[in-house]
A protein has these predicted regions:
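Short hydrophobic beta-strand segments
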Residues: 10-12
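C-terminal accessory helical subdomains adjacent to catalytic cores in phosphodiester-
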Residues: 1-8, 17-45, 54-179
Length: 179
């Protein structure tokens, strides 16, 4: 029995576009929707979604550690836009009050600018990570196809061919796959 058939997933992200992207990747990696025990995304229009994820992360991680940290095979997947911050700066902000270790089944994904940057790259319509592709991909559906494509891309590509945020994401997915 593979790790993925036993593992369950908790997802914390900004919006439905990110959620669909994560689900698409997970499906391609061997998880199905029944593996998702928790999906938490910012209520539309309530506040800055990036801020909401940052504020929610500490509580979610503590719940994850307390409820699932001992003996259960649960993976926590977090996605937050980088906006104008680098991947490392955004991760540092997120983990300001609580740190994740490399051995924990916690993965943090930070699309530079926003998830639409990754969509543009996967479509071959990409100039750089600083450009905002949100308008062009705002109504793109389903986003899950991009998650599936990223899985294939991570498995087949050299990291040096990827934008920095995608290189980091592929490393995070690889680390989770090895746990």
């Amino acid at each position: 029995m593979s790790n993925k058939t036993r593992s369950q997933l908790m997802i914390l992200c900004e919006d439905k576009a990110q959620l669909d992207f994560i689900k698409g990747y997970c499906k391609e990696a061997g998880w199905d929707n029944r593996a998702i025990i928790s999906q938490d995304l910012c209520p539309a229009g309530s506040q800055s979604a990036e801020q909401w994820v940052r504020e929610r992360f500490e509580k979610t991680l503590r719940t994850f550690r307390g409820k699932y940290g001992q003996g259960r095979s649960v993976v926590l997947l977090v996605m937050i836009d980088g906006d104008k911050f680098s991947v490392s700066e955004r991760k540092k902000q997120l983990q300001q009050n609580v740190q994740c270790t490399a051995q924990e089944p916690v993965a943090i994904f930070v699309p530079k600018r926003n998830i639409q940057s990754w969509m543009a790259f996967l479509d071959g319509d990409f100039e750089n990570e600083e450009q905002d592709y949100k308008q062009k991909y705002q109504r793109q559906s389903p986003n899950s196809k991009y998650g599936r494509n990223l899985r294939k891309f991570c498995l087949s590509s050299s990291p040096e061919k990827l934008p920095a945020s995608l290189e980091d994401a592929c490393k995070e997915w690889g680390r989770i796959d090895r746990l």
